């Protein structure tokens, strides 16, 4: 069965949002510190699909063990979903990634 790993579940500006004084953004609870939305689907054969690659991608990937990415699925072209594409280079060194 494929495994879904959420790398980020925040808004397009992340959580906390800069300058926001709401209860969530001022919370000290680690669950209220969320990077922008992204996920990885890992299949039983080891293949991995990255869903969106926002500006938090580098930090997200440093938080999990390194493994190849076989395909990038972009849900739409907003910066919070594509802003980390340049950080895919370590994953595409001497191999290609389908987009």
Where are these regions (language model features)?
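Active-site metal-binding motif and surrounding structural segment of the metallo-beta-lactamase
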Residues: 46-99
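Conserved beta-strand hairpin/beta-sheet module of binuclear metal-dependent hydrolase folds
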Residues: 2-63
């Amino acid at each position: 069965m494929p495994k879904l790993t959420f790398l980020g579940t925040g808004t397009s500006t992340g959580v906390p949002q800069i300058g926001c004084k709401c209860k969530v953004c001022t919370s000290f609870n680690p669950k209220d510190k969320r990077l922008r939305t992204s996920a990885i689907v890992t299949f039983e054969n080891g293949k991995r699909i990255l869903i969106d690659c926002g500006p938090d991608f580098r930090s997200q990937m440093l938080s999990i063990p390194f493994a190849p990415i076989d395909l990038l699925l972009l849900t739409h072209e907003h910066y919070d979903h594509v802003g980390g594409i340049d950080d895919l280079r370590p994953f595409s060194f001497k191999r290609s990634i389908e987009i």
